[in-house]
């Protein structure tokens, strides 16, 4: 376009030149020759400029190409490093954890009930029992114990031999950090079939879960999820002091889980696994009272439960501590069997029973782990915590309390709250409990 205008401009110059030199032939020839030369020169100049522009663009392109190669190399290095990090991240396990605390028999003798009534001013307040241990119970994802009594408001509250407590006892358990209570034990029918049902109602009203008794078959298995880990709970009893047979034949009591039918237990464990349980915890009420070693029936059934798929078997009933063993299942898993944990709280003691073991108990702190990537699960750690159950006297009566022994021995946070005589009992409870818990099982 520019060239077109240039030619027009030059044509005008030529026209003017021709007019001015119309009488001079030589001048006309020179003018034409000069203009032609000018056009040629301008064309050459344009070509030179275009070539310079082309060369500049080529040089720029080459520089850009070199820069791109460097950038590409940098990007490749960065991409490789990113991929390596991603590969490492894929291999690195994503561990989820859950802390379970397991406790023994939660009893309520008449002295405990009377104290709670006096403390509550006409109501029932059991909170003093747990003054020293509540922080420990709360510090867990799930805390579970055996509720060895009933709660039936239609019958008098009582201790041994037919236990019955007000609903407030369960509320106090909830307040100190309990999440689950087992309701299958030899005292489950102390207030008859009605008591089995009212106890379940009271447990739910307190905000707790129960396992071992049920209103429908789906409640045989209690499934809880903590931090992405699913834990199934099962509970069974050897019987109910024969009371079921006084009311109806035991096989017709359709609201309790019994130990007699091994196929049912095996089926329950398989069902729990089918429901997605990562770990299965079984609470059997078994063994012989006041025996520090499990009998053959306990060891046989406990190990079978692990072989069937259970991971933890937490026994109760003897009211004294029995050994804890790690047992390798037939599929290579390692399961834990605690044959008996003793009395978490009760008014059984040396003075009343002439047996110091009944005032000693064991709490288990169990750390469970699951790798979300590989799906691998394991019992990561188990810690033994001995407990001593002692009594005090005040204006309300006999104040029964449980004591985590580590808190009352040298360096413990409650060291100064007991006298030397009490500390000696606490030390004995600590040592005896750890010794029996670590005793091997044949």
Give residue ranges: language-model regions.
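Acidic, metal/ion-coordinating pockets
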Residues: 23, 30-58, 63-442
């Amino acid at each position: 376009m520019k060239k077109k205008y240039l030619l027009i401009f030059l044509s005008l110059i030529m026209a003017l030149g021709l007019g001015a030199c119309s009488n001079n032939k030589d001048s006309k020839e020179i003018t034409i020759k000069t203009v032609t030369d000018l056009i040629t020169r301008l064309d050459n100049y344009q070509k030179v400029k275009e070539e310079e522009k082309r060369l500049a663009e080529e040089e720029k392109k080459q520089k850009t190409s070199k820069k791109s190669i460097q950038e590409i190399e940098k990007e490749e290095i960065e991409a490789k490093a990113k991929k390596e990090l991603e590969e490492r991240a894929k291999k690195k396990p994503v561990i989820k954890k859950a802390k379970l605390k397991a406790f023994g028999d939660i009893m309520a003798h008449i002295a405990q009930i009377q104290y709670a009534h006096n403390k509550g001013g006409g109501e029932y307040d059991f909170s003093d029992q747990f003054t020293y241990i509540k922080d420990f119970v709360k510090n867990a994802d799930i805390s579970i114990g055996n509720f060895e009594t009933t709660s039936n408001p239609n019958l008098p509250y009582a201790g041994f031999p037919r236990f019955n407590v007000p609903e407030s006892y369960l509320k106090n358990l909830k307040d100190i950090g309990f999440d689950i209570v087992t309701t299958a034990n030899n005292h489950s029918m102390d207030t008859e079939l009605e008591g089995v049902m009212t106890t379940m109602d009271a447990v739910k009203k307190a905000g707790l879960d129960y396992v071992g008794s049920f209103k429908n078959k789906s409640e045989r298995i209690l499934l809880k999820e903590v931090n992405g880990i699913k834990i199934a709970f099962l509970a069974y009893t050897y019987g109910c002091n024969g009371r079921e047979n006084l009311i109806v034949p035991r096989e017709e009591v359709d609201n309790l889980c019994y130990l007699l039918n091994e196929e049912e237990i095996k089926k329950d464990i398989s069902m729990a696994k089918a429901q997605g349980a990562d770990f299965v915890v079984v609470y059997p009420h078994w063994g012989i009272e006041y025996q520090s070693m499990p009998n053959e029936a306990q060891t046989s059934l406990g190990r079978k439960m692990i072989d069937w798929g259970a991971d933890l078997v937490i026994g109760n009933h003897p009211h004294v501590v029995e050994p804890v063993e790690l047992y390798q299942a037939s599929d290579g898993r390692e399961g834990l069997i605690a044959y008996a944990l003793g009395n978490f709280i009760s008014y059984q003691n040396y003075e009343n029973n002439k047996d110091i073991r009944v005032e000693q108990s064991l709490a288990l702190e169990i750390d469970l782990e699951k790798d979300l990537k590989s799906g691998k699960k394991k019992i990561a750690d188990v810690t033994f915590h001995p407990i001593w159950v002692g009594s005090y006297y005040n204006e309300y009566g006999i104040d029964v309390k449980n004591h985590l022994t580590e808190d009352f021995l040298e360096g413990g946070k409650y060291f100064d709250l007991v006298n030397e005589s009490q500390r000696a009992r606490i030390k004995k409870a600590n040592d005896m409990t750890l010794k029996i818990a670590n005793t091997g099982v044949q």
